């Protein structure tokens, strides 16, 4: 499943686009062979390792021979950051940045499905909480993510303590995004009620666009076979059979534009993407009305400009 050759090829293609600028690899902590994939990413030329879907407590050890590689955890609470910082400090490292992801993001969430809409888990409440914890350990940047749509959202979240922002769903709706045309069409045509929460074999709730896959899910589907053994919580397909789909197969199908069998992740605001635009136009839309200090922050190297997901 986790091919070094594939990782190297992905990075070669990414380098053609970003040149010598920082290139990050986003690696789920929940995958099997997590340590090997971190190793592969570094060998392939990653400047930054980003990790969510769990607490990557062992990450400093995995990069100890590569002090120039930045390590960036994704958290959904100040408590999670405290645990990470305490463990990493003992290993001689601290985060080079932290991504604070709220429950309006696309894909896997950091809290239980029944807790997603509680006030205490909303981005505007967890950013100050994470900042308070961050200040105890240093001044590494806080990158806010999850449901950020426009310049007003950027200003508000930075006033609450974020140093930068991360957007994903809006960039799917750009000409330059390498998502399939089918994926883009599904996003552009999605209505508000089409953005739904699904149970994932990863063990976390996920936010996706409702397609035929979601409509026809059958729990306890014993016909599902495990071919990749990709994530530990799934336990060789046991989790996939419980929820009714294989995460590896269905995400692969979405990448390849298979409308009926693909799992198309989207943030809560995905339905607001109603046409494709260029990345340049999107960036201009996001930063033009912002205050000067916010524009400067968005432009700094603290932003992870290019990310490979693995």
Residue spans for each PLM region:
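Short His-Asn-centered micro-motif
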Residues: 52, 145-146
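Conserved active-site-proximal phosphate/metal-binding subdomains
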Residues: 105-143, 149-310
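Active-site entrance/lid segments in N-terminal catalytic domains of soluble metabolic enzymes
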Residues: 1-137
């Amino acid at each position: 499943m986790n091919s070094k050759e594939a990782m190297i090829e992905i990075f070669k293609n990414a380098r053609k686009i970003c040149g010598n600028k920082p290139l990050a690899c986003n690696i789920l902590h929940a995958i099997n062979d997590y340590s090997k994939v971190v190793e592969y990413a570094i060998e392939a030329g990653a400047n930054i390792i980003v990790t969510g879907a769990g607490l990557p407590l062992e990450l400093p050890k995995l990069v100890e021979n590569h002090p120039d590689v930045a390590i960036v955890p994704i958290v959904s609470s100040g408590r999670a950051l405290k645990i990470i910082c305490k463990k990493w400090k003992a290993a001689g490292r601290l985060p080079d940045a932290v991504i604070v992801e709220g429950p309006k993001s696309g894909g896997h969430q950091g809290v239980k499905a029944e807790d997603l809409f509680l006030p205490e888990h909303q981005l505007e409440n967890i950013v100050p909480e994470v900042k308070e914890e961050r200040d105890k350990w240093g001044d590494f940047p806080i990158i806010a993510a999850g449901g950020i749509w426009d310049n007003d959202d950027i200003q508000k979240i930075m006033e609450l303590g974020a140093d930068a922002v991360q957007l994903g769903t809006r960039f799917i709706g750009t000409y330059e995004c390498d998502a399939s045309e089918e994926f883009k069409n599904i996003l552009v045509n999605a209505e508000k009620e089409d953005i739904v929460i699904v149970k994932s074999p990863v063990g976390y709730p996920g936010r996706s666009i409702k397609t035929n896959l979601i409509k026809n899910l059958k729990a306890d589907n014993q016909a599902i076979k495990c071919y990749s053994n990709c994530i530990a919580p799934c336990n060789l397909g046991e989790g996939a059979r419980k929820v009714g789909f294989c995460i590896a197969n269905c995400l692969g199908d979405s990448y390849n534009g298979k409308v009926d069998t693909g799992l198309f992740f989207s943030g809560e605001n995905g339905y607001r993407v109603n046409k494709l635009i260029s990345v340049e136009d999107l960036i201009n839309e996001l930063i033009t009305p912002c205050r000067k200090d916010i524009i400067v922050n968005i432009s700094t190297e603290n932003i992870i400009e290019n990310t490979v997901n693995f």
